[in-house]
Amino acid sequence: MEQRIVLAHDGSINADWVARYALRMAAGLPGRRLQVIHILDGSVDRDRIAPRFAAIARECVREGLHCELLIRDLHGDVAASLLAAMQPGAVSHCLCGARVAARGRGFLAGTVSERLLRSGQCNVLAVRVVSPGLLGCPRTLLFPLAGHPRGFRSAMPFLLLLAQPTARLHLLRVMVVGHLHLGHLSAATARARIALGYDYLTRVADEIRAQADAPPCHLERHAVLAADWAGEILVQAGKLGVQMILLGASERSLPHRVVYGNPLERILRDTACDVGIYCRP
């Protein structure tokens, strides 16, 4: 089964912006396949969907992509209907939006995108678009890494689809130290911990170069100690001038009811650049 990009389109202008990412990522697949799905849940008239789908179809013709446009009735909830319409497993890379919900519910908590990320049925990338003028083509990316022994494997499908050979990729390891403890670390201890972070990032960089047919020509490593994980990611993103942050999601890290204290929600809320939250099946 050929890999494909699946765009979950809710009929909004935000989904049109996410579509730019979907088009560019589909162009990087061998089969160049894009599937666009809208579920008729009553929030958007069918008449509003038709011109948006027509615009995507024209872009697919222009880019030489194989495009499938689907409008499906609602069965159960929107997330379940979307999952039923797409091929399950690692062959599908589902893109959806992450935009602020009504009544201060946050960007992911309680949304269709959160349920897709939690589903575990396919690769999912929820994108918050801050700079639509990038047209889904960020040139500088920041990948914060948690130091998991599996290295970069969970992020690799998204790296291969997003990072062009001319892109600048920043690998970031933020090692969290408590506020009180951070101020009392000796210089030698701090250097030793940072060295461990750089060792981990070196292994990840080697893995990227080994697996990518055309790895990014600029691959840089950054290891820091900080008391505030989310805050440090935002600081580093600003300092490095990145155009997109990619963050891995887990069942534990995804917001459900708690919004304001959740680090993913905080980054989505305070970011000055595009953000992608990814999860693999």
Feature-to-residue mapping (PLM):
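Conserved acidic residues
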Residues: Q3, V91-S92, Q121, R139, ...
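Short, solvent-exposed amphipathic alpha-helices that sit
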Residues: V18-Y21, R48-I56, S81, L196-E207, ...
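Active-site phosphate/pyrophosphate- and oxyanion-stabilizing loops and adjacent acidic/basic residues
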Residues: L23, E114, P157, D206, ...
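Structural beta-alpha unit
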Residues: R24, D41-S43, P51, R58-C94, ...
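Glycine-rich, Arg-bearing micro-motifs that act as flexible, cationic patches
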Residues: C96-R115, S119, G136-P138, M244-D270
